[in-house]
Amino acid sequence: MARIAGVDIPNDKRVVISLTYVYGIGLATSKKILAAAGISEDIRVKDLTSDQEDAIRREVDAIKVEGDLRREVNMNIKRLMEIGSYRGIRHRRGLPVRGQNTKNNARTRKGKAVAIAGKKK
């Protein structure tokens, strides 16, 4: 397994797919990285030369991925909560942030339904 940005990427998959195992790299970014490094998308990770691996590492190092990206996202959410914006309040309360209805759904964000005693008749 090749190690890129602290993540072991699978050997038997194509490089374009294997790079998506790194947090912050999707399919589009993966294709851009390979184009900049001059590597074919169809080649498998196990068939990469050490020079090609180094070229991929250099391209990935120029992008914010893994821990740095997670930290930045968390800091952005924390900033929204501190300034007291609507989005920050929704984050703090554990409710949907992007305007979804909460009367019936939003179970993923709100958690398991809690029964209220004395509600049934």
Curated annotation (Swiss-Prot):
The organism sits in which domain of life?
Bacteria
- Region (Disordered) spans which residues? 96-121
One cellular component term from this protein's GO annotations in UniProt: small ribosomal subunit
Q: Which GO terms describe its molecular function?
A: rRNA binding; structural constituent of ribosome; tRNA binding
One biological-process term from Gene Ontology?
Answer: translation
Tell whether Signal is among the UniProt keywords.
no
Annotated function: Located at the top of the head of the 30S subunit, it contacts several helices of the 16S rRNA. In the 70S ribosome it contacts the 23S rRNA (bridge B1a) and protein L5 of the 50S subunit (bridge B1b), connecting the 2 subunits; these bridges are implicated in subunit movement. Contacts the tRNAs in the A and P-sites.
Subunit structure of this chain's protein: Part of the 30S ribosomal subunit. Forms a loose heterodimer with protein S19. Forms two bridges to the 50S subunit in the 70S ribosome.
The Swiss-Prot or TrEMBL record describes its family as follows: Belongs to the universal ribosomal protein uS13 family.
Q: What is this protein called?
A: Small ribosomal subunit protein uS13
